[in-house]
Amino acid sequence: MTSSNFPKAERLLRRPEFLQFNEGASKLHTQYFLVLLKPNEGTGTRVGFTVSKKVGNAVVRNSIKRRLREFYRQNKSLFISADINIVAKKGADVLDFHQISTELAAAFGRLRKKYA
């Protein structure tokens, strides 16, 4: 059974880790999210979340990040072994958890087919 936690080893935490997506990352656009994917050197899946001030105030941004973390925690099996950054687009603040899950599950299904 897959562990349902989100340890630091599975997170992108530092600025240089996020800047690596500027060059050579694969992009997948959905209506409310941009998924950036870059293969890593065998370190497993690492995930980061970016929600800019364009999306909303701090309360809204933190709420979206909590929902994204929960989606990752519950759906680790959908994620391929790579560095992944999920960027929320303007308008993502109106989504509830179920809508986020549906949209991202479809996106990661497409990524699995592409990189399988």
Curated annotation (Swiss-Prot):
A molecular function (GO) term: 3'-tRNA processing endoribonuclease activity
Pfam family, one: Ribonuclease_P
Key words, A-Z: Endonuclease, Hydrolase, Nuclease, RNA-binding, tRNA processing
Catalytic reaction list: Endonucleolytic cleavage of RNA, removing 5'-extranucleotides from tRNA precursor
Top-level lineage group: Bacteria
Matching InterPro entries: Ribosomal_Su5_D2-typ_SF, Ribsml_uS5_D2-typ_fold_subgr, RNase_P
Keyword Aminoacyl-tRNA synthetase applies: no
Entry EC number(s): 3.1.26.5
GO annotation, cellular component aspect: ribonuclease P complex
Gene Ontology biological process: tRNA 5'-leader removal
Subunit structure: Consists of a catalytic RNA component (M1 or rnpB) and a protein subunit.
Family assignment from sequence similarity: Belongs to the RnpA family.
Cited function: RNaseP catalyzes the removal of the 5'-leader sequence from pre-tRNA to produce the mature 5'-terminus. It can also cleave other RNA substrates such as 4.5S RNA. The protein component plays an auxiliary but essential role in vivo by binding to the 5'-leader sequence and broadening the substrate specificity of the ribozyme.
Protein known as: Ribonuclease P protein component
Organism per entry: Citrifermentans bemidjiense (strain ATCC BAA-1014 / DSM 16622 / JCM 12645 / Bem)
